[in-house]
């Protein structure tokens, strides 16, 4: 499973609350992504910050993509509810699953997850999008 995540409203948080709060938000995203990847992987897994406010995750898991994405959504919701910050930390996520025997590369899956992420951003939703590799 490949996820491409992009933080929502980093510029607004930086402008209103300062860069320390923006950095806090970026660390929060990394922590939540790492917690879920560590908990759900059945093989190797990795979370990487790939630029600015974007993260990529790749993991082997037997969990259905939609369930894993719901766990991420729930984790962000809980963290925001428990936070004393005057803002919520949210991400938009694109996802692509590689099936055993799939001929597509990890780079293909990351590219497709990235395309889906920007579809989500274009629709201005804090949601996840899914795309089959056959796109």
PLM segments and residue spans:
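Conserved long alpha-helical elements within nucleotide-processing catalytic cores of c-di-GMP signaling
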Residues: 1, 8-35, 48-52, 56-57, ...
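Active-site core of bacterial EAL-family cyclic-dinucleotide phosphodiesterase domains
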Residues: 3, 134-135
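Generic enzyme active-site microenvironment
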Residues: 4, 90
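Cofactor-binding loops of NAD(P)H-dependent oxidoreductases
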Residues: 5, 96
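Alpha-helix termini
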Residues: 37-44, 80-83
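A short pre-motif secondary-structure segment
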Residues: 43-49, 87
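Catalytic-core segments of nucleotide cyclases and related cyclic-nucleotide turnover enzymes
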Residues: 62, 70-73, 77, 81, ...
